[in-house]
Amino acid sequence: MKRLHKRFLLATFCALFTATLQAADVTITVNGRVVAKPCTIQTKEANVNLGDLYTRNLQQPGSASGWHNITLSLTDCPVETSAVTAIVTGSTDNTGYYKNEGTAENIQIELRDDQDAALKNGDSKTVIVDEITRNAQFPLKARAITVNGNASQGTIEALINVIYTWQ
C-alpha cells in the first residue's frame, strides 16, 4: 500500500510540473540599416550678406535684391556613396518664402538652385558625387524679395537648415 501511495504521489507531482513546463512562443525582432558612410561636410556654415538694400527699390510687388551665390561643399565621399541629397528647412511666412526674422517688414528670402528651381521649406536637391574627386557640390543662390511690395526699413535675417542624406 505504501508503494501504491508513493507512486500516486509521484504521478501527481509529475503531472503538476508538466502543467507548468509548457512551451511559449517567442519572437525575436532584429532591426538595422545598411547605409553609406557619410562625406565630409566642408561648408558647415554659409553666411550671405545682402548688403544695404534701399526701400525705394523694394516698393513694387515682386521687387528683389540681386542674387548672392552660395556653394555647399562635401568632400571625401566614400566609393559606396554615389549621390547626396540636401533637404532645406526653415520658417516660412504666408507667401511660402523663407520668413524674414529681422525688423524689416514685407521682405522674404528666396532660395534657388543652379538650375533656377525654387527650394522652399522641405524641398530637396540631389547631386551626383564626382567619381574622380569623390566630392559633391550644391550651387545655390539667395536673395531678398518683397512679394507684396512696400518693404520697410530694418534688418534682414533668416535661418535655413540643410539636412544631408547619402545614397
Curated annotation (Swiss-Prot):
Signal peptide range in chain numbering: 1-23
Family: Belongs to the fimbrial protein family.
Gene3D superfamilies in the record: Fimbrial-type adhesion domain (2.60.40.1090)
Pfam family membership, one: Fimbrial
Protein name, as recorded: Uncharacterized fimbrial-like protein YdeR
Keywords of this entry: Disulfide bond, Fimbrium, Signal
Subcellular location(s) of the protein: Fimbrium
GO biological process assignments: cell adhesion involved in single-species biofilm formation
Cellular component terms (Gene Ontology): pilus
Positions of disulphide bridges: 39-77
InterPro entries the UniProt entry points to: Adhesion_dom_fimbrial (IPR000259), Adhesion_dom_fimbrial_sf (IPR036937), Adhesion_dom_sf (IPR008966), Bact_Fimbrial_Adh_Pro (IPR050263)
Predominant subcellular localization, coarse grouping: other
